[in-house]
């Protein structure tokens, strides 16, 4: 399946009963559930590796005919109908009459009884009646999408977004589809073009320009240069004439959607964020030193002059940066600062961008910590933070410490500093790690401006110096090959040095052999030798999603090994089952839930009558019961991309490293992957791929003017 969940490959059987020949289907099938029956339109082609396959251009669902097929359709397509309820429906109406009778009057579900004559729970009945009405609308929409060459798997999302009037909405302005996450401009454009919209239609051009800017943001850019925008729009829209594009951009500027500033094109919202954040940070950088509290070192706590220097800076300056390499003492410095500030009766807030990072901060410092979103009291119903300039954090705190600050995007940093008030703020991070997932590079821009007081710790402490993980990470950071064996490390560092055997390199050359080695390491060798639980303690981190050693392939293989058997399927489309390890792919701020992007969980069990799943999160500290629909935002997580692992650490980490990833390999990517390991890291793959990554020291450039805005404020 592709990253946007649109493209997928399925193995299908022909015929209404599924008893015909097997065929490989490729195309916009990412939202299709296993066991679905489809009518597909497309062409047969011959693939050089996979042979003959059917390339699906569009499809629609076909209703099943058999009793088993109807029951399966009910459980996979209608929320609230579990296996017991589905079987009772088929027995009551007969397989050949279920759709006819329920389309006519879904209230007839109230007549259904179990095989023993018991009534179906009222809650399940009400949910199923409401769901049937929605599904009926979805089936009508599938026909509409099919006629316009769009995969019918999107229908459910569109109905949830636009309601019963969805066909009228899409006919009136197909480009409204781009409002939905993970549905691209090209899908909307296919509908629009099939409805007769011209290439140079003004609505089309404006939607295309918006999409190019949004895609740039997803790559971390706050803006695009005009030339970059024109080139991206030309490729997307297939319009070579600049004049209509300039007219469309002018319209977006007049409508307040876009800001053009010195050849830089921003979405207005991002321009406002960057400008506001620049002013807030600039004011802190220019502020005269003022003592927040008196401080004396605690003689019972060992602290270096550099570490105590951080305490002195934070005590007197409203914004301080603490950066440093692994093992340099950033965490110990935070502990010293918190202990000193609390002795002075300061109110201290510890926070981090992710829940995993906040828990790690809590465990390492011994003090409570929370996500930045929780600290700022994000309200999902209002889509805004309750803490702001009118209700600042300084009403409750004197000092704010933010860990993993390299993950701060423009949006999150803007919200934080808009609400900081008179608090002194310490940002702690490692600028050599990957930049944030969202637009901007706040910590790197602050460092580059050289306007904000910064302490960069480099010394390696004795306990950390024993770790080959830390020694190798430091070598990677400086462009040198990591120690590929403990013997090599001892030879380089001195034969009598004490070292922990916590970093290994396993040489493999072909992608398939790398994959096999990863499976053996995760499932057998690491548990047997080191005692780690392969389900709970070992994480595989990969550079990219596709390929034989990509995220999808490894997750499928590891699911078979680590969650075998016929455990109950919870969400058919994604293959999530009871026992699966899963990861949240977008922030969920639902009251009493709050699961952040990147949080890992286990599916403990599934109630098919209530259509709810019970999850274990926070390393077993928390359990949640969620509707199965909420699991649409989760993916299997025996393996994660390195990017998604930011802010997290795991007891044991396995990193496949292949030249098959060559376009993605870089020094920051390898450095970030290695530093996710707490006790054991195994790098598996090709030495040449490691060398290639080390040679790419620079991260991909991001368009940001935050440092420039800071410098401008310094001269005001």
Which residue ranges define each predicted feature?
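Structural detector for short beta-strands of small beta-barrel domains
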Residues: 1-8, 42, 600-604
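Beta-strand/loop nucleic-acid-binding surfaces
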Residues: 9-33
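Accessory alpha-helical DNA-binding modules that contact the DNA backbone or grooves
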Residues: 33, 48-263, 319, 323, ...
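Flexible glycine-rich surface loops and low-complexity tracts that mediate binding to linear polymers
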Residues: 35-50, 652-655
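Pre-P-loop entry segment of helicase/translocase ATPase cores
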Residues: 202-206, 214-218, 253-312
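Conserved helicase motor core of P-loop NTPases
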Residues: 288, 310, 330, 432-592, ...
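ASCE P-loop NTPase helicase motor core
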Residues: 311, 320-493, 688
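C-terminal accessory regions
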Residues: 478, 599-716
